[in-house]
Amino acid sequence: MAVGTIETSILTDIANAIRYKAGVATLYKPREMAAAVSALDGTDAGNYQAQPYMALESGVLPESVFEDIADAIRGQNGLSTLYQPGDMAAAILALEWDVGYKVRALLLDDGTLEFNYYDRRCTVYGGTIQQAFEVDTSGYSSASARSWDSVKLLVRRAYIDSSIAGLGITNCAYWFNSFAECTEVRGFENLSGITNATQMFTSCGKLETIYATSFTNAITSSGSMFYGCSRLVGGTDGYVPTSTSAGSVCKLGTGGVLTNPNADSRTWFYGHFYADGQAVLTATATPDATRELLATGRICAIGKYTGMGFTPWDSTNRPQLTSVHFAADMGSFAALNLIYLFYSCTNLATITGLGNLANVGSMRYTFSSCAVTELDFRGFDPSTLTDLFYCFSGCSSLTTIYADSSWALPSSGISGMQCFYNCRSLVGGNGTAWSSSNTNYTYMRIDTASTPGYLTAA
């Protein structure tokens, strides 16, 4: 596509502007100009020579030539301005370069916020720099004091470059506070030795991963460091911080929130929540295209979640969840926790596919306060269960739990206080009625004359 007739003087002005900023006498063809603009870095070679206007006054060029030049200008100045060809020479002459070694936060066009330390604006992660901010390494007294606070909702991931590592930065308070759309932080090992992490990740509700190949923990101030990080899962054992977790959990290994990218033990399943009220839990990331999708998201199979806020049916969607199906591929996981999965889903009345699950460990609060009237565990192997704490608590409409006649809980390594709290409608297959005196996990067994329980063999 062409832009129509273009005055050659416009091209000469653009080329002269490039030559002036670079201090060169180079002759540029129209298609070379965008690359030449992108290559400008504030260096003046001291050999500027302007070229006169051409005798040919006009010509026709593809639209893409000027689109590319405009993109290159925006890549240099970090603005979103739309440039007409006649505006481009002035825009090039107006370019200024942020030079000198300093810590910068660079917002890239893919939503990455890169922190690095170089003598000029440049990206290691890759992409086009949209905006640049100088980082005050002495720290910030609030989130709003950060130079990059205005772009916090545009950040999809953060990258901390190795050039930061040797600077001795100790105060990272509020750095990632309220990055509500950020799912991961990479290069966290380059912040080893920080001492102040106050509200560093507060209200990062979509944050799943903080990657680090190593980390030296010297944190002494960490108030509300992980407050609201309901989806953050450590890569070793699925550890999930609480809203009050201190900086001591900022570590690799058991009980740590960090993940070594070279030793990530986590696997993920997906919850596809459809407009008809059903959620399908599956190992398949792609939802059913023939159904209207309300929400979708992934859940860590080994995640030791500590409350609500990690499922697609959380917040405003929760009351709309009426049925759940576990797909056949949910049996493919080597380890699976269902902690808080349907907690307080008060309209959830139907759950199918429990027999498709395998290697289930913790079912802490899994069905708490649901509206189910019966559950079918036939085909479910209980031998790996470790935790049934409040699993069915508050299921006041639950009348029947079916299981295979061979059902047997592990003889050790399992707990589950108040597993059946307030399940006042529940009756076992041999007629054992729920009692407030028998709410422990031990009653999750087949009801017989010699071993009363709340399960019905089928």
Regions found by a protein language model. Give the residues of each.
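LRR flanking "cap" motifs
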Residues: N116-G168, G271-Y274, Q278-F333
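Low-complexity, Pro/Thr/Ser/Gly/Ala-rich linker/spacer regions in secreted
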Residues: G42-G46, A94-V103, T259-W268, A458
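Surface-exposed receptor/substrate recognition regions of extracellular proteins
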Residues: M1-G100, V324
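N-terminal module-boundary/linker segments of secreted carbohydrate-active enzymes
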Residues: E7, P62, V99-G111, D264-G277
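Structural signature of tandem-repeat unit edges
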Residues: D110-T112, L153-G168, A180-T195, C204-T220, ...
